Amino acid sequence: MIHSLILSDRRNNQYKTLGILIFIIYPILSFPFILKGILKRERWAYLLGAILMGYIGMLYPPAGDMYRYAEDFNLYKELDWEYFWIFMALKFDYFLPLLSWILGKLGAYPESTRFLFVACSYYLLLDLYHDTTLSNKDMTRRTRVYSLILLVPLTFSIYLFRMGFAQVVLVYGIYWFLMKNRKKGLFFIIFAVFIHVSYMPFIFIAIASRYKIFNFSSNVFCYLCFLLIFIESSSLGVTLLRSLPFSESLLVHLEEYISGSQSENLSSQFTVRQLIAKYFFNIVYYITLYQYYVFYKLNPQPLKIKRFVNIFIIVIIMSSSVPILHARLLDVLKVFLILSSLCFMNNSFRMQRLLRIVVVFTIINILFSFWQIRFFLKFSRIDVLFTSSSVSIDRFSLYG
């Protein structure tokens, strides 16, 4: 028995060493090793998988907001500490400017921020996968594979932006603060606000979730879900915003999302295929909401998690007059509901069937997301990933 355990441990170490060596020499070939290591819940595989996705993010072209990030990066690196803080006074999302300034002073290129955003996002997602699959003893190997697809999607492009990175940090913090009762979760929730200020309501939601006033019956929760799905616009979000004790400059910044250029609902400009993609996302969202409702009735979850979701849904309903913020909050809700469902997933036929449906539509959404960024992929340098070693990729820069 002991001899077989020693041999198994030795084989695992050899497999790990081989995977790391291949990653250094030719990272794309190490993907099968990384995937197998992830399914076996090996930390080294999480790290290499996150770095590999970070490479893809680094080689992606600086389009849209990423171009502005690159321009700001090149500006910040030329500033001394005193002038940099003058620029910081005009910002409300402090993390990216500070990170850009530090990396710029160290001689890094703008691509380094994209690498860190994507790599850190995937490592946090893989850590959630690790803890979720370990905590739920009822999970089969197939369910673990489903969990990997749902929690660690290949849609890397959303993590290139502050919003996507902040969303991952936020969900990570909510998980540890509410589900695991760890104080480090509150740190990540606050950190997410410094990455993107629009997630500030979650600080209040996390604190309010400890109060019993938000204990709702399953019927009240069902009514909230009905409002969430069918209410399209409301002035409650604007009224709530004006009642909060924020500085005037911050209120002006936030109101840009309500009455400024950020408030426009772009759905009317979508093509037929983009609308189809949106509806597929909504299907995933509705199914996960129904899944959570079933768990809500069965009562397997701690009350503080239920209270958190109840308050969260109320805030989303009130934000319906702010299309871009409303959409972002719905994204966070979808991820959290999936995470919550996986934590309490059982092997009943109904739950497994719903899980398979969510996985199928999630895969379709992933394919749609690649179709949507096909134009940018043509101008990316992802081909470098197939011809270079890790050392060469680390030194690679579109500006070099």
Predicted regions and their residues:
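TM-lumen/periplasm interface segments of multi-pass membrane proteins
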Residues: 2-10, 39-118, 372-400
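Transmembrane-helix signature of polytopic, membrane-embedded enzymes
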Residues: 40, 129-151
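Membrane-interfacial loop-to-transmembrane alpha-helix junctions, especially the N-terminal start
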Residues: 41-47, 299-311, 353-360
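Alpha-helical transmembrane segments and terminal signal-anchor/GPI-anchor hydrophobic tails
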Residues: 61-62, 67-71, 76-77, 82, ...
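Transmembrane-helix motifs of polytopic, lipid-linked glycan transferases
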Residues: 116-135
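Membrane-interface alpha helices of multi-pass inner-membrane proteins
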Residues: 153-155, 184-208, 317
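Membrane-water interface signatures at transmembrane helix termini and the short loops
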Residues: 155-170, 174, 195, 290-348
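Short hydrophobic alpha-helices at membrane interfaces in multi-pass membrane enzymes
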Residues: 176-191, 204, 216-223
